[in-house]
């Protein structure tokens, strides 16, 4: 499997592109949820772009923990921040869930299950891996499809020293 190294700028561009797709669809979210960690930079850019175009939305993070290492998942997915979200967002509101990638789909499925139909939900991801998706979920909005191993700008785990030197802006003396 080929590794594709992504830049921070590409995630911002993808957030802007997702905002354009949401606006073009005519659907207007009341609230954005960025899935911590990977969905955060994309959700921030998406939120900024919607605001710049005049669409004001609330925003919150949800921390979703399922990976213990590269391509290794826990059997249970823990979600932090759900109580805070439901405390501020009344049932029936339009909620856009934003993540970096829909890979196997289990993270997004766990969030959808936890929300329990409380909201009108749509999903937006920068990257979709349809061949690896083990759920019936498909993102409502996505920019790219791939089967590549995606290496996000913040990721170091699972990389060889040579890959870090070639693709990561680490400071002198760090390695």
Segments the model singles out, each with a brief description of its role:
Residues 1-175:
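PRPP-associated nucleotide enzymes
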């Amino acid at each position: 499997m080929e590794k594709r190294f992504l830049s921070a700028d590409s995630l911002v561009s993808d957030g802007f592109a997702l905002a354009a797709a949401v606006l073009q669809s005519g659907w207007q979210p009341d609230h954005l949820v960025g899935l911590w960690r990977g969905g955060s930079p994309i959700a921030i850019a998406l939120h900024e772009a919607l605001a710049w175009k005049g669409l004001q939305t609330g925003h919150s993070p949800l921390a979703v923990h399922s990976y213990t290492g590269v391509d290794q998942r826990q059997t249970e997915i823990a979600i932090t921040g759900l109580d805070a979200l439901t405390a501020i967002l009344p049932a029936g509101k339009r909620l856009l869930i934003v993540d970096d990638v829909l890979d196997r789909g289990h993270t997004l499925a766990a969030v959808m299950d936890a929300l329990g139909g409380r909201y009108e939900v749509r999903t937006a991801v920068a990257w979709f891996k349809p061949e690896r998706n083990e759920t019936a979920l498909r993102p409502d909005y996505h920019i790219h499809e791939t089967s590549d191993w995606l290496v996000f700008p913040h990721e170091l785990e699972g990389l060889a020293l040579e890959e870090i030197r070639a693709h990561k802006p680490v400071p002198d003396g760090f390695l």
